[in-house]
């Protein structure tokens, strides 16, 4: 999946390159890997939740404003 901003893609590639080149100690790599994956999984859940909330709000408001929007 490549649907994230170019700046983050670049940063991701830079981290991977530093790891490949041995510029980061192995214990630090493990720490980065664990916290990064944990953070990204929590962000995925959070965004999914907000997406669901936004959809529910849109449905609710769409129904509420239906009579106002009929005249368009």
Curated annotation (Swiss-Prot):
Stated name of the protein: SPbeta prophage-derived uncharacterized protein YorV
Originating species: Bacillus subtilis (strain 168)
Source species taxonomy: Bacteria, Bacillati, Bacillota, Bacilli, Bacillales
